[in-house]
Structure formats: C-alpha cells, structure tokens
Amino acid sequence: MAADSDPESEVFEITDFTTASEWERFISKVEEVLTEWKLIGETSNKPPEKGEYTSGVWEEKGEEVLFADFRFSIRHHYLVQKSSEKEEKEDTGEDSIPVCMQDLLCTNNDFPPVAHCLVRWYGLREFVVISPGANDAVISESKCNLLLSSVSIALGNTGCQVPLFVQVHQKWRKLYVGECRGPGVRTDFEMVHLRKVPNQYTHLSGLLDIFKSKIGCPLTALPPVNIAIRFTYVLQDWQQYFWPQQPPDIDALIGGEVGGLEFGKLPFGACEDPISELHLATTWPCLTEGIIVDNDVYSDLDPLQAPQWSVRVRKADNPQCMLGDFVSEFFRLCRRKESTDELLGKSAFEENGKEGADISQALSKLTEPAPVPIHKLSVTSMVHSARKKIRKHRGADESPLNNDVLNAILFFLFPDTKSLDGSEAKPSTSTGNISSQSESEDYNLYSQLKSAPSNSLTYKLALCLCMVNFYHGGVKGVAHLWQEFVLEMRYRWENNFLIPGLANGSPDLKCCLLHQKLQMLNCCLERKKARDEGKKGNPLYSSSESSVNKTASDLLSPVEADKSKYEVAKSWDSWSDSEEEFFECHSDTEELKESGQESARKAKEETKENPSPKPEGRLHQSGNLMLLNSGEPLYIPVTQDPAPMTDDLLEEQSEVLAKLGTSAEGAHLRARMQSACLLSDMESFKAANPGCCLEDFVRWYSPRDYIEEEVMDDKGNKIFKGELSARMKIPNNMWVEAWETAKPIPARRQRRLFDDTKEAEKVLHYLAVQKPADLTRHLLPCVIHAALLKLKEEEAAEDIPSGRKAIKQIISHSSKVLRFPSPDDKKLEDVISQISNVEAAIARARSLKAKFAIDRCEKSEEREDLEKFVSCLLDQPEVPIIGAGRGAAGTIIHKMFVQRALTLAPVEEEPKRSSSSDDRRQTSGTDFPSPAGRELILRTSVPRPAPYSKVLPQRMYSVLTKEDFRLTGAFSSDTSFF
C-alpha cells in the first residue's frame, strides 16, 4: 500500500486529441512546413521589373509529407529579389492586399519565355505547390475537395499569404487548383482544360463573355477590361532555305579515293539542320476592351501591325554532328578486346624472325660479300620493304586498307620517305617547326591535356587512326595501320633513320605515354648515331678499339675493309659496351670477339698500373678554378647524359625504390641505385683531372656544398679557405663512398648509363603488343586535343561569345580528366558530349546566318544588326525584334512565313476552325498562316461579391492551340462580411 501511495510511482499518460485523424495530422504537417520556410504573415516586395521573371534567378525547395500512406511533395517556388532597407521599414497598413494579388495586375512580365507554368498563367513571383508522389495522382472529386479544404485550413491557421496550389488529375494535364488568403480577402485559382474547343471561345469576344460572367460584378457600369494578346506562328519547313553544311562524300572515302580525304583535317558540322523550328510571337501588350474587334466574323489582329515581335528557335534534338561522331566512334574502340593478331591473323614477325635477327646482328655484316653502307640506303624503300613481310602472308585483297590509302597515310606520317637522301632527310625540319610554334597558346594546349604537340607524329597518327576507324574498315583498319606503323619503327631503328615529327631531347613528360615512347626510340637512335659517328671520326681511338678494327680488316679484303670500317665500329659498341647485351656470333667471328675482349682487359690493367694517367675526356676549362692539390687548371669533363625516362619507367623505378623499405640497409641500397650517374660523373672527372680530390669535384658539381671563408695568412694577406659542407661530412656519406670507388675512366670507355639497344628493343616490343583498345586510350587525349583546336578554329570564324566560354570550360574539364593515367569512361563521355554540344551550337549559328542571308547583306549597319540578332538567338530563350515587322529581321521573317503560307494545302488547316479563320484572315488582309497558338490575358479590378465590397484584382488567362484549350482564372473576393 505504501508503494501504491508513493507519488513517484504514479504514471500519467498524456494523449493529444488535437491531431487525432490522419487528415488533421496532414494539415498540421503542412502548417509546420510553411512555418519552417518562414512563409507566415505579410510580405512586402517591390513590383517586379520588366523581364525580371526571365532574367532573374528562380529558386525552389521541397519537403515530403504523408497523408496516411499517400506521399505528397511540397515545393516552394520563388523569385530571388533584393529588398532595400527602406522597403523593409515600410508598414503595409490594414488595407493592403497580398503581394500575389498585386502580381495579378502587373503587366511587366506577361508571356515569359522560360518559367514555371503557374508563373505564365497567373503572373506570380512566389507560390507553393502540393503534388502527389512520383507515379500517383489525385483523380476523384472527393479527394480533390479534401485537399483543397486542407489547403484552406492551413492558410487560415498560419496566416500565410503565399498562394498554395494542389495538383490534381494526371500530371501530364498540369491541372492545379489553389487559394491565397489575406486580411479580409481571398483569391481562388481555378482551371479548365479541354481537348475540343467550343467555337464561341476561339476569339476575344467569346472569352470576354466568360470573364464577365465569372466575375459577376454587381455594378451596372463595368470598369474596362485590360487585354494582352499574343499570337505564335511556327515555321517548320526549312527546305527552301539554304543549308550551308556540305557533308563529306562517304562513297568516295569508302571506295578509297584519296583525293576526297585530307589527312590531318577533322570533319566538322551537323549532317542535318540543327534548327528544327522558328517561333514568331506577335504581341499586343496593352489593349482596352472596345478599341479592338476580334470575333467569329472579323478580326483587327493583323500580325504585321503588332507593336511587338519576338522570336525563339527550337533546336533539333541531338543533331548528328560529324566531329562528335568522329570522336565517339574512336572512343568506342576502347571497349574492344581483340589483339592485332586476332584481327589480322598471325603476325609475320615470328615467321620472319630469322631474317630480322640477321638484320639486328651487326657483326654479321662483316662476313657479307658486298656489304652496303647504311648511310647510302634510300629512305624511299622504307615503307615498301617493311610491308613485304606482311604481304607475303596476306593477299592485297584481304587487307583492310587498300594500297592507295595506306601509302597516302604513311607518306603523310613520314614525309621524309619522299627524300632520296636518307641520312639527313626531314626529321630536322619537323623539329624546327615544333620549336617555332612553341609560343602559341593553342600549341601549348597539349601540356594541359597530356596529349602531344599539334604537329608531332603522335598527333598525326591519332588523326589518321581516327579517320581510318571512321571511313576505312573500323577496328581492323586501325590494327592494319598500327601494324604497318610498328614495322616502320623497327625499320628505322635497324637502319639508323631518325623518326620525323618528334622534338629532340628526352621524352616530354607533359605528353601522352605513346609520344614519350616514340621520343625514347628517337633518343636511342640519336645516341646510337652520335656514338657511331664519334667513333668513326675520332683519330685518337683507344688501343682496344684499334685492335678490333685491325682484326676486322684482316678478315676482309682491302676494299671491303675500308667499306666496313664504319660497320665494325658500330657492331663493336653494340656488344662490348654493355654487359647485359649479347649477340649470337658466327663461327668466323669468334676470334674477333676474343681479341676485342682481351684488348679491353689490357686497357683496364694499364689504367690500374699507371697511378697518374694522362688526362682524358676533357671538354673545356672551368673558368679560373684550379685543383686544390696540384694547382693545375680544373677541366670540365665529357660526361654521359643521364638515361631518359618515361612515365611508366619512373613509376616502375619508384615502386622498386619503395619496396626497399625504410631500414638502414634499404636506404643504403636505394642511395646506391640512385648514384649511378654520380659515379659516372666522378670517373669522368678523375680522368679529366688527374690528381684531383673530392673537394675539387664538389666545387664543380655542387658549389653550394663547398663553403669558402675569407681568412688572414701568416703574412696578413687575405686568402680564401674552403671546406665541405656539413652534409658532406656525415659519416658513411654516399658521395665519399662513391669517390673512393670511382676510377679515372673517361665517359667513352665507361659502361653506358643508357643502353640504347636494350631500351629501343623494349620500346619496339611495347609498341608491337599494343591492342587497338590500348592504342585508343593512349591517343584519345590527342584526338580530344585536335577536336578542341577544331572547335576554336570554327568558333573564331563565326565569333560566338557563348561558344568561346564553352570551349574554355571544356578545356578546363578535359585537363582535369586526362591528367589521370586511366581516366574514367563516364567522364570521357561527358567531355565528348560537351564537344558535340559546342559543335551543334556553331552549326546552329551557321544555319541561322544562312537563313537570314547575312552574307548577302550589303549594308554594313544592317549586317551588324542581323549578326547581333542571330547571336542573341543562340544565347537567349527569346529575342525581341527591333522595329517589329518593319525591321530588317522582321522583313526576312515575314517573307519566310508568306512562303510557308503559300505552300500550305487547305487540308492542313484545322477542320473545326478553317472556315472562320480563313474568313477572318481575308477580312483583315494578312498574308500570314493561321497562328499555332493564341494567348490572351484579361485583367480588371472590381468589387466582389457586393457593390460595397473592396475593389480587388481579377485575372483570366487563355491559351488555344491545335491540341488543347486551357482557361486559368484568379478571382478575388472580399471576405470581411461574407
């Protein structure tokens, strides 16, 4: 009992009976949303400026509510307006009406070209819409009335003065009913939607009767009704107008007629007219009842006399554009899985392996009876001899590319094949072109996109592969051309011919990987040629090399020995300078090989025995620097260039170094691996400066690590005394260790830091195993680069400001996407889609310029006006015509519609209105066809429902088209005593 009497043990259950039903909960939730959005109470905003509904910023926010298990979406639409402090301080007063009622009478934004349908029908700047969920609809009349009652209660409880609409029936009908409440006033928003139009409502007089009967004004003398009328005419048939785009001759291209194909030039333009319709709106913005006649017998509404004309164009949906299709088709190759061998059959490389091996063996040339010096070969035979290997196993008819097209492409890619002098043909000239264009902004675009310079071999190859894919056999044609390209690369490597269209020097890491690989191959060729030429022309050749030459001469006749001297030097270097390169030698060259190795060993032993060898490998004296120990001048040595690297090699090297870990042993090994170039430079320095010390090397190699101080000697003279920096004095310093290990060996006798033979074979193997899909991914940045340059070129010819802005956005977007090694396919598709959109915009500009005959305009002022008009048509949803039907653009448009009206057959007229429309047209004397749409806005202010009620705005909007008829009304009434 004591526990039961304890007040803390008592539990009270509180039941809220105020929201007992689902309907009341729904109303409560709507009120909560309105309160959360701060739509409670009065609002005071300045009247909207003219055209603000179109140029202003519209925003919306939404929330979801439930009515039992039925989901509704509440969305608040409003025009963003800046209110001044003066307007915020103003008191609205008791007699003020809600802002939405004031908007009903505002004429500044009638017929906005782009707006929510409720904005166009009622002229509102702010409203809330309650609509059913995604696939639901409120169809029954009882549910519609229930929702409307909920809206009315929520507005009354919250004091919200923003109009609230409910969407009913199927969503495609866009049927809304709603209400707006203010202090003592209310506006009901109603709507009628019909498919068949009664004849009496097809003209102004019939609509005035509806409006007046709906208002039910008790006054005997009705105030005048203000009227705004707009007729819209649609021009769809453009066949009689010139379409400037000339499509390519596809039959000629497919048939292999090279004359119809210009390599390096991308196609551009739309294959169909990108402008599908032109809409002319003739507007009478401010008319008064009684000053105009428009009934079923006669009409004063002549479009030529309309004070306002405006035009909009309807764009074709996804017009077929050649540049976009070109790039898209190339991008689709990324998804192919086949290899080149699967597409073309077994490669001829394996079956001709022995032949290729014989060519690659440099020493075998010594035993040939009549060797031909390489530098005397004609480059003209490159393409033909390389392709013979493939064509032995594949007939000409089976090749995806015919001979004419293939020859044209290869001559375009390798212009030096036309030269009879193969040693110094045109690679140097192509390099000059590259350097001369380096200042251009468009030229430097490749560094942003990681593609290749626009006049490089890689860039040209991308365009040719893209063209072959589009016009000549698709993926098989691409595989065929790539196979020929790889053969050409191997031929050039084996015969010491530089690759044209590539800049000198190390691979440019700002370019795509394929371009870097080709540059690497060219680097190998340059090193190989420079080494061979240097050995051939150097009279002070080392004893080991001289003995090799002598041995080789003994094996041949005197005449043959002279011819093969250059060959021997090249061959000796190809196998003796690298410990990792071995070549199979014939039996008659084993003696030569042993002799060469023995000579090399003797040279090394002599170096060890002689502690003070003669200086070797000097480049030039280094200013006034002297050796610290001997006082001799310090000479800069001839050093080996560091090994060029590509992106994949750098990544591979980074992975290897990272796997060494963070231990002391790993760090030491990592430092040893990275100091190969340092050790080579130290050996070259020791050979050029006998008797030098580490301090001498640091003074030349890293001056910041040698610190000099000004001190006084015993005699009081100022002298400079130097020492190594602190980091050079660290125990077990890698520099000290490398210096102690280094031997005085000049660069020409050192082991090569960069084995050009090995690296070239790596590149050639890398090229040979590329599938068409891999090749496409490598070259897609180049194709996008070319497409952007084409867009810039075409836009400059048309001068489209919006086009320039769009191109800059594409470049910015592309540079972010293509910087990654493996870009996402979806992002690449977005870039290609943006390119197609800009191409379509430029094609639309050309179409409009052709239709308005701007090129044939003789007056400069009139021409400028038309160009400005066309530019506005591309950027703005609707453009007013200066001078209406009497202006330059208006006259041209009038002629278009007159021609259209003359070609229309009577059966195309609307059956139910043909007689009245024809009669009224003949009466008014207009030569325009019947309008495709008629819009009317009727406004007035009357007391309602009693004569002594407050004068409130009334509005009705009507739109009549061939498909349907819609009436929307906003009728206000005084609720103070009713």
Swiss-Prot record:
PANTHER family: RAB3 GTPASE-ACTIVATING PROTEIN CATALYTIC SUBUNIT. Residues 533-554, 586-621, 908-936 are annotated as: Disordered. The gene is rab3gap1. InterPro entries: Rab3GAP1, Rab3GAP1_C, Rab3GAP1_conserved. Keywords: Cytoplasm, Endoplasmic reticulum, Golgi apparatus, GTPase activation. This is Rab3 GTPase-activating protein catalytic subunit. The Rab3 GTPase-activating complex is a heterodimer composed of rab3gap1 and rab3gap2. The Rab3 GTPase-activating complex interacts with DMXL2. Interacts with LMAN1. GO terms for molecular function: GTPase activator activity; guanyl-nucleotide exchange factor activity. Coiled coil: none annotated. The keyword Repeat does not apply. It comes from the Eukaryota. GO terms for biological process: brain development; positive regulation of autophagosome assembly. The lineage of its organism: Eukaryota, Metazoa, Chordata, Craniata, Vertebrata. Its main location: cytoplasm. GO terms for cellular component: cis-Golgi network; endoplasmic reticulum. Residues 540-554 have a biased composition (Polar residues). Catalytic subunit of the Rab3 GTPase-activating (Rab3GAP) complex composed of rab3gap1 and rab3gap2, which has GTPase-activating protein (GAP) activity towards various Rab3 subfamily members (RAB3A, RAB3B, RAB3C and RAB3D), RAB5A and RAB43, and guanine nucleotide exchange factor (GEF) activity towards RAB18. As part of the Rab3GAP complex, acts as a GAP for Rab3 proteins by converting active RAB3-GTP to the inactive form RAB3-GDP. Rab3 proteins are involved in regulated exocytosis of neurotransmitters and hormones. It is found in: Cytoplasm; Endoplasmic reticulum; Golgi apparatus, cis-Golgi network. Pfam families: Rab3-GAP_cat_C, Rab3-GTPase_cat. Residues 586-619, 909-922 have a biased composition (Basic and acidic residues). Belongs to the Rab3-GAP catalytic subunit family.
